[in-house]
Amino acid sequence: MKVKIKQIYQFEGASSLPAYSTNGSAGMDLYAAIASPMIIKPHETALVPAGIAISLPYGYEAQIRSRSGLASKFGVIVLNSPGTIDSDYRGELKIIMINLGQKDFQLTPAMRIAQMVIAKYEVVSWELVDDLDETERGKNGFGSSGLK
């Protein structure tokens, strides 16, 4: 599938376009479109520009997710993961990041900061009913299926 993309920020000597790291990657890396290093202090958030805008076809969304390395090594994650980019949004993608670690985290220009997964979705219509179908699980939730 081809998706239209507008490059808003051009890195010196590097591309800001999302890229798959391996042939089997589901997510494309997104890069920090910043001109100079940026510090995210412990327990603080930052809105980090990705330097691109996209035009997704109707019926698709882009999901913005944390990178496992940043999460496991530094405690830095995408706050509203997965963040949804709707098919009718045309502005620059920006990533809400939070530092859950104990130390300052330094973002550098062109650093890989998040992943973007393109996903198909269905538009639903609601059918109002008095009762729902019975299931074995019923209304049990919040750990009711056990840990093992």
Swiss-Prot record:
It catalyses: dUTP + H2O = dUMP + diphosphate + H(+). One of its GO terms (biological process) is dUTP catabolic process. It comes from the Bacteria. The keyword Magnesium applies. Keywords: Hydrolase, Magnesium, Metal-binding, Nucleotide metabolism. It holds the Pfam family dUTPase. Substrate binds at R67, S68, G69, N80, T84, I85, D86, K94. Its cofactor is Mg(2+). Its EC number is 3.6.1.23. GO terms for molecular function: dUTP diphosphatase activity; magnesium ion binding. Pathway: Pyrimidine metabolism; dUMP biosynthesis; dUMP from dCTP (dUTP route): step 2/2. The keyword Glycosyltransferase does not apply. This enzyme is involved in nucleotide metabolism: it produces dUMP, the immediate precursor of thymidine nucleotides and it decreases the intracellular concentration of dUTP so that uracil cannot be incorporated into DNA. Belongs to the dUTPase family. NCBIfam families: dut (TIGR00576), PRK00601.1 (NF001862). This is Deoxyuridine 5'-triphosphate nucleotidohydrolase. The gene is dut.
